[in-house]
Amino acid sequence: MGNLKIYPGKLSGEVKIPPSKSMAHRAVICAALGDGVSKVTNIDYSDDIIATIEAMSSLGAKITKKEDYLEVYGINSPENIKANSVKEQRTIDCNESGSTLRFLVPIAALFDGVNRFVGRGNLGKRPLDTYYKIFDEQGIKYSYKDGILDLKTEGKLKAGEFKMEGNISSQFITGLLFTLPLLDGDSKIVITTEMESKGYIDLTLRAIKDFGVEIINNNYEEFIIKGNQIYKSIDYRVEGDYSQAAFFFCADALSSNIVLNDLKLDSLQGDKEVIDILQRMGLKLNNKDNGLIGSASLGLKSTIIDGSQCPDIIPVVSLVAALSEGTTEIINAGRLRIKECDRLAAVTSELNKLGAKIIEKEEGLIIEGVKELKGNVEVWSHKDHRIAMTMAIASTMCKERIILKDYECVSKSYPQFWDDFKNLGGVFDEWNVGE
């Protein structure tokens, strides 16, 4: 992978926020489980979304990329799922997408035969014990290899009661919420501890409802799921992504002048929390030309940030905290250690290289604000898209240019990030060792 030399300078202009990766995963899956032909518009073909498209294709959906939309011929009704099941081995390549893996493991258990899940990067280190416990209880066969993703499952999921802790990744609960309505009997998911990442569950329930499936949510303590339901085929537009918008909201908080377009103001996305966090720190938001623009003319102040409901935005809000007055504490963010990299360690290491003062804790960060970042150093993305984009926004506040190693990893979630960064006035060029 390559290196970029990125020069200081504020960003200015308008940016169309890319489609929500979280909603695109859900739309593709619901459409692929549907009873006819769906059309999904405003979709971005990031590496993770391609992984989900190809995974659902391997289960029998026919998915075609058109010029400006995705055409999805669904696997069809529960009866047709049974009729189309063939006892065979199918390989489901999740690439580096944790969402694809955890969403698809129970969905694949709708089918007879052997399912083999493979992937790359840190995906083999993502825990799947929650599913293994269910497999043990239901007699579903499985085998796996330590350290890499090579999981084989054989056996069909049965309806029933599923007890799950609320502090696990919401991806496990989402995977079951997709699958259980298609089983013969009724099911219940019982949450045994307080639910974290409620926003992601809300997104799942919204998508499922949009596609015609009903699930009763009893205050996130239990979910009641009738069996033998059918996903309807619909036309679906994916809304803008607040987890990607977070980078530009944070840039505005740090004195850039960016208008963010194509965001749904009543979105259920958990990462919309970035607005509340930045407003507590001093950001003022205004409407401009049907978009949003922020500024912090009175300065930024510290706050306490709970990472349990919005883990993906923690790297970039840590950057804002590093340049705010006072000491910010980030809590309940231990899950960041098992993302594409250990994001708590990566944020601490790379921002401290730039002159930040961050202390890493087991479940979070202590960030003492500084007045400026120095630059003239080499930082590393850790091959993590969110770390790479955080470093790009950090460069706008540095006194001197920085060199970012392994910048291409943004393709995982935001393939056109560097184009948008350049169009907003960001200045960078390729850099080779020895120059």
UniProtKB/Swiss-Prot annotation:
GO terms for cellular component: cytoplasm. One of its GO terms (biological process) is amino acid biosynthetic process. It is an enzyme of class 2 (transferase). The active site is at residue 312. The keyword Secreted does not apply. Signal peptide: none annotated. Pfam families: EPSP_synthase. Pathway: Metabolic intermediate biosynthesis; chorismate biosynthesis; chorismate from D-erythrose 4-phosphate and phosphoenolpyruvate: step 6/7. It comes from the Bacteria. It is found in: Cytoplasm. Phosphoenolpyruvate binds at residues 21, 98, 126, 171, 343, 386, 412. It catalyses: 3-phosphoshikimate + phosphoenolpyruvate = 5-O-(1-carboxyvinyl)-3-phosphoshikimate + phosphate. The keyword Flavoprotein does not apply. Its EC number is 2.5.1.19. Monomer. Belongs to the EPSP synthase family. This is 3-phosphoshikimate 1-carboxyvinyltransferase. The gene is aroA.
